Each structure stands twice: as structure tokens, then as C-alpha cells.
Amino acid sequence: MSYIEKIDKNRIPQHIAIIMDGNGRWAKQRGKERTYGHQAGAETVHKIIEDAARLGVKYLTLYTFSTENWNRPQEEVAALMNLLVDSIEEETLMKNNIRFRIIGDIKKLPAEVQEGLSRCIEHTANNTGTCLVLALSYSSRWEMTEAVRQIATLAKTGEISPEQITDEYITAHLTTNFMPDPDLLIRTGGEIRLSNYLLWQCAYSELYFCDTFWPDFDKEEFCKAIYEYQQRERRFGKTSEQIS
């Protein structure tokens, strides 16, 4: 029986976050340039977005471009920016009733990229299905630094007192404040680390790591991750007896 058949359709994770890793190594195995891998990875993005929408995932957050990725070779960054504009298919989003959002330091993106993304956000704003969130020019340390800076400014001007700064207050000042924390974090490509991604939000997320490079990640592997998630007991610091 395939994992597509095994999963419980009534217990799909509300929020799935993915670190899409392995494009470059996938291309290298085939004697191709890294950009070839990124192009193949973009095709996988389209498929997984549609799979998530059909399964009823409420939020799908994809680690698309980190703040550290700006340090990559200039030609690779330029190719990624061009691919980003071309790969956001508004028609697919509208067909699947998908709402589009972005988190990250987007002011660093090229103007034409910002304009294209803003149009897509505006045009899909009233969609009520899966919310697709791209983490662009994003890192958790950047996000938390921005939140601390905002809160420190409010404290300096006397708008808040230190006693008002709670877990919830900090969460409200993060770029992800419009969605719940991830239930499941998936990382492809064989690496076992979080790479500065949603560190605050993934405090109690279930983690799934697989060796599959992102271009080869398909619906079966996606459903395997969901199945593994469904086999786990989420305790959030409590005992099994407390949550049963």
C-alpha cells in the first residue's frame, strides 16, 4: 500500500514547512549546472503546492531563498531571481484557490521581483484555500532581530513596559504572525539541520528529514512525511497521560 493510501485524510497537518534542499547536488549528479537543478526544483514546487491544496493543508511555507543565499555566486543569484518571477504561476494559484504570502526582507529583492510578487499577493488575497508562504531573503536570526528592534523602540518611547513583553507579544511581532506554528517541518536532501529557518516557530514542530533531493521529491514522499507525522504523539512538554 502506498503512503498516499495510508495517510489519514482527517488528520492532515494544518501547517507544513519545507526546507527544499538538494537542487545543486541533483544537477551535479547529472553533469549539469546548479541552475538546471533549480529549474527542476521549481517544477517540484508546482506539484507539491497542488498536492498540498488537494490534501487540505491550510498553510504551506517554503524556504525559497535565505539571507545567507545572497553570498552565493552572483550569476546563480541572478538566475534564481529570474526563476522566481517565472515560477510563480498565478493561474495555478487561482485554479486551486490558493492565497499567496511572503515572509522575509523583501526590500532586498530586485524591484521587478517585488512588483511581480506584490501583484500575486493582491490578486490572490480573497482566495480561501491553502495559504502558500514563500520565505524569501529570510532567516530566523534576521526575523528575531527585527522583532527585538521593534519592541525595543516601543519600550524606549514608553508605549510598553518590560513586563508586557511575553512569548505571545514577541510572536505578534514576527513576520509569521498571521499563521500558526508549523506542525510538520520537512527537509529534503539528506542534511539534518534547520539552517536558520523558523527557529522560534518550530519549537514543538515534528521534524522529518529525507535523503531525497528536492527535484525528486514527489507526492508519495510528501505523503510519507505526513504519515510519519501521524504516527507520532505530540505532547508539547506534557506526559502521554495528560494528553490522552
UniProtKB/Swiss-Prot annotation:
One biological process term in Gene Ontology: polyprenol biosynthetic process
InterPro entries: UPP_synth-like (IPR001441), UPP_synth-like_CS (IPR018520), UPP_synth-like_sf (IPR036424)
Binding annotation for substrate: 22-26, 34, 38, 66-68, 70, 72, 187, 193-195
Cofactors: Mg(2+)
Keywords: Magnesium, Metal-binding, Transferase
EC number: 2.5.1.-
List of catalytic residues: 21, 69 (proton acceptor)
Entry annotated with the keyword Repressor: no
MF annotations from Gene Ontology: magnesium ion binding; prenyltransferase activity
Cited Pfam families: Prenyltransf
UniProt similarity note: Belongs to the UPP synthase family.
NCBIfam families the UniProt entry points to: PRK14830.1, PRK14838.1, uppS
Subunit-structure text: Homodimer.
UniProt cross-references to HAMAP family, sorted A to Z: ISPT
Described purpose of this protein according to its UniProt entry: Catalyzes the condensation of isopentenyl diphosphate (IPP) with allylic pyrophosphates generating different type of terpenoids.
Protein name as it appears in the record: Isoprenyl transferase
Species in which this protein is naturally found: Bacteroides thetaiotaomicron (strain ATCC 29148 / DSM 2079 / JCM 5827 / CCUG 10774 / NCTC 10582 / VPI-5482 / E50)
